[in-house]
Design a protein with these regions (language model features):
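Residue-level detector of high-confidence beta-strand sites
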Residues: 94, 106-109, 167, 222, ...
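CN hydrolase (nitrilase-like) catalytic-core segments centered on the catalytic cysteine
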Residues: 60, 64-78, 149-228
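Short, acidic/polar
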Residues: 18-27, 148-155
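Extreme N-terminal starter segment of soluble prokaryotic enzymes
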Residues: 1-6
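Short polar catalytic/cofactor-binding loops
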Residues: 9-14
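C-terminal beta-strand edge segments of enzyme domains
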Residues: 128, 201-264
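Active-site catalytic loop in hydrolytic enzyme cores
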Residues: 86-160, 173-183, 245-249
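Cys-nucleophile CN-hydrolase/nitrilase-fold catalytic domain and related Cys-dependent amidase chemistry
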Residues: 16, 24-100, 173-190
């Protein structure tokens, strides 16, 4: 099975309406069956200063989410977008997945950045989402920003059957670490033998590129830019493998979850 994916970056603002306009402009360039991934906080906006949360209009955010959901269903595409959202009085850093069949999936970031702690609540499990495509079902895992530094999370997603791992990123202002973050993403792909698609906020100094990496660790597309840009790649899922995972010495070192529902 081959998937067509669009990894989109743009300068994420604190204006929900402006972000939605740009997201919509990207969706207009898709074709049925596409998978589309946007950065962390792409709709709500994002900042390392948590005061930005006070500016989020929940009604405007809800309207934006509904618009993306309708467009995903109408265009027959799967869209993943970053959203900081208040649920039952708690803030979560999330990735919302809008499926071509009208379903919505949500991942709540489990490993928060230092400036997020005490402000955001953490997610409590690492789900693998099974999505329908015209050619069959595809299993996808999600990670957000700094979670690229925790390979055990990626390894768990792979062991739970994820074929593609999407990484919604918002890492800017210090490009001296760009080679480090790029290396992390290449390693996450190669060690799990999964496709990794990472969409970063567009900025003059990106900490990490917007990038697509194949299961063998080869970079199949990369963007380093402060502008709206789109990376279109084809993913041959036959390249996904458990060759290395099956050679793990799980009798000595094993990855396990404290949440038994994670691989459901």
């Amino acid at each position: 099975m081959t998937l067509s994916a669009v990894v989109a970056q743009f300068p994420v603002t604190l204006s929900i309406q402006r972000n939605l306009e740009i997201i919509h402009s990207v969706l207009e360039q898709t074709t049925p069956g596409d998978w589309v991934v946007f950065p962390e906080g792409a709709l709500s906006g994002y900042s390392t200063d948590p005061i930005f949360l006070k500016q989020i209009n929940q009604q405007e955010l809800t309207t934006g989410l509904r618009h993306i959901q309708k467009e995903s269903e109408r265009r027959k595409i799967n869209v993943w977008v970053g959203v900081c959202i208040n649920q039952d009085g708690k803030w979560f850093n999330t990735a919302h997945g809008f499926c071509a069949d009208g379903k919505t999936q949500v991942y709540h970031k489990i490993n928060l950045a230092n400036h997020e702690r005490g402000v955001f609540s953490t997610g409590n499990h690492l789900p693998v989402f099974e999505l329908n495509t015209p050619d069959g079902k595809v299993r996808v895992g999600i990670q957000i920003c700094r979670e690229l530094r925790f390979p055990e999370q990626w390894g768990w997603l792979a062991r739970c059957g994820a074929q593609v791992i999407l990484h919604l990123n918002n890492a800017v202002d210090d490009d001296s670490f760009q080679s480090v973050w790029k290396s992390h993403l290449i390693s996450r792909a190669a060690e799990t033998q999964r496709f990794v698609l990472s969409a970063n906020n567009a900025a003059p100094k990106q900490v990490s590129p917007t990038i697509a990496v194949a299961p063998d660790g080869q970079v199949i597309g990369e963007i380093v830019s402060a502008e709206l840009e789109i990376l279109r790649v084809e993913l041959d899922l036959s390249k996904v493998s458990n060759w290395y995972l099956d050679q793990s010495r799980s009798d000595i070192v094993a990855i396990k979850s404290n949440n038994i529902q994670n691989c459901a």
